[in-house]
Regions:
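N-terminal capping/linker segments that flank leucine-rich repeat
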Residues: 2, 21-94, 249-277
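Ankyrin-repeat and related helical/solenoid repeat scaffolds used for protein-protein interactions
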Residues: 198-254
């Protein structure tokens, strides 16, 4: 009797071991899947169409592993109002989402981005740009920003024309080569720490004075239709094209003796002179 009891215990123990091992094997074969929430149906629809969302269904989620494979997103004019979920695209390098309906976006987790193009949205706020250490191209034109701070070590090209900008702070942009800021409401600009700047375009603003003495690499300056009372380009030896016409309170543009500027566009009431009093 004792022997039967003993064998019964052994058999039960063996069965429990087999069941436990079976569960472990099942877990190995069927790992827990992580999903990313994508609440915007138009965003997910495009992910499905581009073969990024592997389940092929618009169901407000994609696999995190799908998101992590993506290095480039092209989302031009897709009716997208939210890019919630983009934080899981941790290997994203290039984001093109022009002509949508975005109001805000947080790119704090997309630290590998080198190109961001969000032209023609409804943006008033963007977060996380200072974390994108590879960022060289930033286009935010045709949006609704009223203030903006550029704080990124590597940005070379910055486009922010056709906004409602009243305040623009260039806090940290040592590698900036080109800035386009046409048609805003900016009254002051300071690019004194952007020593590599070659192209500066800010026509149709409200700027009265600007100190460009540090920006000796400048080649192109377009600043028509501002409110300048003085304009000194005498310390900029590399200028190719300067357009400073339609500044009604600016009569004299200061240049250096012998300074040659191939294209200098002035209004008929303006002159370029070595002395402006």
């Amino acid at each position: 009797m004792k022997k039967l009891h003993y064998f019964a215990i052994i058999i039960i123990a063996m069965l429990l071991t087999i069941v436990a091992c079976s569960k472990i094997d099942d877990e190995d074969l069927n790992p827990v899947l992580e999903f990313v929430v994508i609440p915007d149906a138009n965003f997910e629809k495009e992910l499905v169409l581009q073969g990024i969302d592997s389940d092929g269904i618009v169901n407000q989620k994609i696999l995190k592993s799908d998101a992590e494979k993506v290095e480039k997103l092209s989302l031009y004019s897709k009716g997208i109002s939210s890019l919630t979920g983009i934080e899981s695209f941790s290997n994203l390098k290039r984001l093109y989402a022009d002509a949508n309906s975005l109001k805000t976006i947080d790119l704090s987790s997309n630290v590998l981005l080198d190109t961001i193009s969000l032209t023609s949205n409804n943006l008033t706020k963007i977060e996380g740009l200072e974390r994108a250490k590879n960022l060289t191209w930033l286009s935010l034109s045709w949006n609704y920003f009223t203030e903006f701070t550029l704080d990124n070590d590597n940005v070379k090209n910055f486009l922010m024309d056709h906004n409602d900008l009243v305040s623009l702070e260039i806090k940290n942009a040592p590698k900036l080569e080109s800035a386009t800021l046409n048609i805003n409401k900016i009254s002051s600009l300071d690019f004194s720490n952007s020593l590599l700047l070659k192209t500066l375009i800010f026509s149709a603003n409200r700027v009265k004075t600007i100190d460009l003495s540090n920006n000796v690499n400048l080649e192109y300056i377009y600043c028509s239709s501002n409110l300048f009372t003085e304009f000194d380009i005498s310390k900029l030896p590399n200028l190719i094209d300067v357009r400073v016409d339609r500044n009604p309170t600016l009569n004299c543009i200061k240049i250096a003796p012998g300074q040659q500027i191939p294209t200098l566009k002035l209004s008929d009431y303006q002159t370029a002179n070595i002395n402006c009093n």
